[in-house]
């Protein structure tokens, strides 16, 4: 069970950006996403980042380049057996890919992508997700309070349907803390972490450090090598 947790990494998510964007969106989700650069996301040609996990005395890193306009994904990391793996694929053609890509790489990509840009996903997914503003609540850490915005996904479809993300949002509309509740029976059932280490790359804002617990065990998720490439440019803009 622990090995599965480390390989699939903490969270399961139902869909990826690009679905149902023309439908009605949650106003509170839009307000949060705008703080992270939603209005300028159309300028972004590619996003680069390395997902780093520290859990149960083990460290895992996965590097990605994602082109949101085309759905092209490039992965540099290891497979479940620890062997080096590099692959590039189109999400629209996922059915053509090997089992390793379909069963390991793409679920990991979706997971890591939600960690790095969840404020956008909460907005993009809001036509199908139940987004509720629950007002000011005490932070799970017990220190201070913030607005609680709950994002609950449908019990049907996706890698792990029925998940709920509780976002604790400050007065500046930045997420300060979040609690993830898994909808199914897979582990972990509960992940609770900070959102800190804020950096900006071009027009986008990223939280690059998350510290907390996964089913009670200490966990840290961090991002390095974060950068964006804007349309019409060949240069990467590093987060700082």
State what each model feature region is.
Residues 16-22:
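Sec/Tat signal peptide C-region and signal peptidase I cleavage site
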Residues 1-5:
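Positively charged n-region of N-terminal signal peptides that target proteins for export
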Residues 41, 66-68, 115-116, 165, ...:
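Tryptophan-centric aromatic hotspots in well-structured domains and transmembrane helices
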Residues 23-30, 89-163, 183-187, 239-240:
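Flexible, processing/modification-adjacent segments and terminal tails
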Residues 64-66, 92-99, 112-113, 122-124, ...:
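A general structural signal for short secondary-structure boundary/capping elements
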Residues 143-239:
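Gly/Pro-enriched, hydrophobic low-complexity segments
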Residues 26-103, 129-138:
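N-terminal mature ectodomain segment of secretory-pathway/periplasmic proteins
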Residues 6-15:
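Bacterial N-terminal signal peptides
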């Amino acid at each position: 069970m622990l090995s599965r947790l480390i390989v699939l990494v903490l969270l399961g998510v139902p869909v990826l950006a690009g679905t149902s964007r023309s439908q009605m969106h949650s106003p509170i989700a839009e307000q949060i996403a705008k703080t992270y650069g939603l209005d300028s996301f159309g300028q972004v040609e590619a996003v680069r980042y390395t997902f780093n996990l520290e859990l149960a005395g083990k460290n895992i890193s996965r590097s990605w380049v994602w082109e949101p306009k085309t759905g092209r994904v490039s992965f540099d990391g290891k497979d479940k057996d620890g062997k080096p793996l590099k692959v590039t694929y189109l999400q629209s053609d996922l059915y053509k890919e090997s089992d390793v890509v379909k069963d390991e790489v793409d679920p990991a990509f979706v997971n890591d992508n939600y960690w790095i840009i969840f404020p956008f996903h909460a907005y993009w997914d809001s036509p199908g997700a139940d987004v509720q503003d629950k007002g000011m609540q005490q932070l799970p850490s017990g220190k201070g309070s913030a607005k609680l915005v709950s994002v609950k996904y449908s019990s049907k479809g996706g890698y792990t349907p029925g998940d709920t993300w509780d976002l604790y949002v400050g007065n500046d509309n930045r997420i300060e803390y979040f609690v993830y509740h898994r909808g199914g029976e897979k582990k972990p059932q509960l992940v609770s972490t900070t959102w800190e280490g804020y950096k900006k790359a071009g027009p986008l804002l990223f939280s690059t450090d998350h510290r907390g617990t996964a089913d009670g065990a200490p966990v840290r998720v961090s991002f390095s090598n974060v950068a964006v490439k804007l349309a019409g440019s060949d240069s990467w803009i590093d987060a700082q």
